[in-house]
Amino acid sequence: PWLMPIQDNLKFLMGDKTSLEMYMEKGKIEIEALTYIRGRSIANAFVVIDEAQNLTKHEIKTIITRIGDGTKIILTGDIEQIDNIYVNETSNGLAHAIESFKQYLIAGHVTFKKGERSELATLASKVL
């Protein structure tokens, strides 16, 4: 079940389920639970960490410190959509990474103003 949001988004971007399955079979796309990243060194890859607003500072550090040479990492998330009771808008891993790396040229931060799901989803994230 935890794979479904990622698979849904990749299927949308690729246009069909067959393309996603083909890339996964060829090892071009890997989807992995955070539990299995410990101890790894990920080199020459493009890593996307989705829903990073729900991660703790420790989890973000665990992920970023696995990044090897030639790898780019993207953290995505919306601090208005936190559903982890152990973090909030200021204590979550995404906010921590943004704040910690803002003075370094090796990192960048982009804030999108418009939600992608729907007007209702955007409103709900603000008012609920």
Predicted regions and their residues:
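Conserved helicase motor core of SF1/SF2 NTP-dependent helicases
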Residues: P1-F46, N54-L128
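Walker B catalytic carboxylates
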Residues: D50
